[in-house]
Structure formats: structure tokens, C-alpha cells
């Protein structure tokens, strides 16, 4: 029974995401934050494309004091969404290699990098590199700390 339920769920998810990409390019509504680069709208998880935020258990160091910068990045994304009354508007771009929906969410992707709480994910896109350079120069967010790039941290600790 569990196997049948899993198969049916997979088929429905596959159909639903195919329909989203075929018919709709945007999804908007009340958003909840999963982590520093993932939100959920209408039950759909959307990975913010072109950026990479610290992992939820990732530590960074400010003045030699460790803090959970993954949690800080998540809280910053929550703050950005609250400015828009808890809503987000995202354009679907693609699926990543794990099957997650990648989206460019109006004002969110760029703000996370510009405010220094995510890095430009240059492995996939240089779109946010300009904003990263500015944040780094101004020592905003992560750039005021000692940190591993999230991709490096995942290689070391996951």
C-alpha cells in the first residue's frame, strides 16, 4: 500500500510540475521559508536559482565567535518576505539535477546576495556576481565573517 501511495504521489508531482512549466511560468502567494535559498508557496518548494546560502547547520565566525550563519540567512530571507506581507512571486526557470524547482523570485534572489546572506552560485550562473562584489566590498552579511562557501561546506561536512 505504501509503495502504491508513493508511486501515485510521484506521478501526481510529475504531472503537476510538468503542467506548471507548460502552462504557468509564475507562482505567487503566501510564502514560508525552508532555508536561506528555498521557499515554499502553495505547497511547492522553490529553490532560488543562481544563489547559494549557508546550510542550516553551517557555522561562520565573527570576531572568532561561532554563530549559525545558515539560520541567520534563513531569518534574513524571512525578513525580506515579511516586507511584502509574507508573499512572494516566483518565475519558474528549470529543474535542478535533484528534481527541485528552480525559480527567480522577484526581489529575493538578488537581495539575498546584495545583502550578503547568499553567494552567487557561479557554477550555474554569473547573474548575481555583480551584487556579490558590492556586498563583499561593503562587508555585508557573510562578508563580515569568516565562512566557507556553502558548496565547500557541503563537500566537507555532508
Q: Across the structure, where does each feature detected by a protein language model lie?
A:
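Small beta-barrel nucleic-acid-binding modules, primarily SNase/OB-fold domains
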Residues: 5-6, 10-11, 16-158
Amino acid at each position: 500500500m505504501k509503495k502504491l501511495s508513493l508511486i501515485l504521489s510521484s506521478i501526481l508531482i510529475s504531472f503537476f510540475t510538468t503542467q506548471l512549466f507548460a502552462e504557468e511560468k509564475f507562482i505567487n502567494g503566501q510564502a514560508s521559508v525552508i532555508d536561506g535559498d528555498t521557499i515554499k508557496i502553495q505547497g511547492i518548494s522553490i529553490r532560488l536559482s543562481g544563489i547559494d546560502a549557508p546550510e542550516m547547520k553551517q557555522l561562520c565566525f565573527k570576531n572568532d565567535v561561532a554563530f549559525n550563519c545558515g539560520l541567520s540567512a534563513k531569518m534574513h530571507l524571512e525578513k525580506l518576505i515579511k516586507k511584502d506581507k509574507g508573499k512572494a512571486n516566483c518565475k519558474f526557470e528549470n529543474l535542478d539535477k535533484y528534481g527541485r524547482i528552480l525559480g527567480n523570485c522577484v526581489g529575493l534572489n538578488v537581495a539575498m546576495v546584495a545583502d550578503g546572506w547568499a553567494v552567487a552560485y557561479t557554477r550555474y550562473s554569473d547573474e548575481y556576481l555583480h551584487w556579490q562584489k558590492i556586498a563583499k566590498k561593503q562587508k555585508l552579511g557573510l562578508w563580515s565573517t569568516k565562512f566557507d562557501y556553502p558548496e565547500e561546506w557541503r563537500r566537507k561536512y555532508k
